[in-house]
């Protein structure tokens, strides 16, 4: 076989970001030649079809389960830090019980990997477009159940199923991704998507003030608890106490602030979002540091770049300040 190596030399456009030059050059060396297989309309149709499969009953009412996986992936994800030998892995992969896709994990999650709120919003758009009031009311019911769980201080468990066995003592023993305590990734997604859901329904003649209140409670909490040293932190207790403050995952709160600002026009949300974005860029992103979007580990993580890219573009659109394009 043949191995080809490429050496790339450049003067970086920005300190610590020579990769930006490299990505531009790669488009010339390795042009993308594949055309889309499906039209956008067909992709949407298939996506909605998949989302409908994720609706499962929970205590007699529909909820969006996080996704379809295999027992093998559940075994890996459920045992953080556990080691599995290659032979053990191969044996399990041959076992249909462990290698068949299905609903092997009961997870009803606000955002992050589960994206329950985003799934609801997309299906709402489809239901409205097709005048499907029955489906729309069912989806509104899902969000009503979530809104009922939120506390006055804005805190909510990121996994709905954890309300069945919630015990504060489990927080110290569980991985952060297991939904026993509020964290800034899911809270940011929650504020953002619920504000969008509120606006979508309002624009179609349906008023759900409790949905907007869901978002403003989260935004009010983080405006009050922003820190110039740790930003929005990572993990919080249901009582509103900071449990873990490391990493860049607090950036997801910026998206929540901006999307809620678009609906409320509360200047505090916009000002706090801009202040926080500057903080995370100066402390983390400008140094090519972007950690803990995965919430359950301190990792260099592409997922955490999402809120900084999106919120920079949003703030440029809102303020027209060129620095956000540089960001």
Region spans (language model):
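Carbohydrate-recognition beta-sandwich/jelly-roll modules
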Residues: 1-189, 196-211, 220
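A short secondary-structure junction motif
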Residues: 54-58, 146-149, 153, 222-233, ...
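Well-ordered alpha-helical segments within folded domains of soluble proteins
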Residues: 107-128, 178-199, 240-262, 297-317, ...
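Alpha-helical solenoid scaffolds that mediate protein-protein interactions
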Residues: 126, 139-147, 197, 215, ...
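Active-site lining segments of carbohydrate-active enzymes
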Residues: 165-181, 192-263, 267, 327
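Non-catalytic carbohydrate-binding regions of carbohydrate-active enzymes
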Residues: 224-225, 264, 276-299, 318-319, ...
């Amino acid at each position: 076989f043949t191995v080809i190596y490429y050496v790339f030399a450049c003067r970086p456009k920005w300190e610590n970001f020579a990769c930006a030059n490299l990505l531009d050059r790669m488009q010339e060396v390795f042009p993308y030649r594949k055309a889309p297989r499906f039209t956008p309309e067909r992709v949407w149709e298939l996506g909605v079809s998949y989302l409908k499969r994720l609706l499962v009953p929970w205590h007699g009412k529909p909820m969006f389960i996080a996704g379809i996986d295999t027992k093998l992936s559940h075994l890996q994800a459920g045992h953080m830090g556990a080691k599995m030998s290659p032979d053990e892995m191969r044996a399990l992969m041959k076992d249909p019980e462990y290698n068949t896709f299905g609903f092997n994990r009961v997870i009803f999650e606000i955002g992050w990997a589960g994206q329950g709120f985003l799934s609801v919003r997309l299906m709402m758009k489809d239901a409205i477009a097709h005048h499907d009031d029955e489906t729309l009311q069912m989806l509104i019911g899902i969000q009503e159940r979530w809104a009922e769980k939120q506390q006055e201080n804005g805190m909510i468990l990121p996994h709905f199923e954890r309300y069945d066995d919630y015990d504060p003592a489990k927080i110290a023993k569980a991985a952060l991704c297991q939904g026993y305590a509020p964290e800034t990734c899911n809270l940011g997604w929650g504020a953002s998507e619920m504000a969008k859901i509120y606006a979508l329904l309002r624009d179609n003649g349906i008023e759900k003030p409790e949905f907007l209140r869901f978002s403003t409670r989260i935004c009010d909490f983080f405006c009050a608890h922003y820190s110039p040293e740790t930003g929005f932190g990572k993990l919080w207790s249901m009582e509103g106490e900071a449990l873990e403050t490391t990493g860049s995952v607090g950036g997801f709160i910026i998206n929540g602030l901006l999307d809620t600002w678009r609906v409320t026009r509360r200047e505090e949300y916009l000002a706090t979002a801009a202040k926080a974005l500057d903080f995370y860029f100066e402390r983390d992103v400008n140094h090519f540091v972007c950690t803990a979007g995965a919430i359950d580990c301190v990792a260099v993580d592409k997922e955490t770049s999402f809120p900084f890219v999106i919120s920079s573009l949003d703030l440029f659109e809102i303020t027209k300040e060129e620095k956000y394009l540089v960001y």
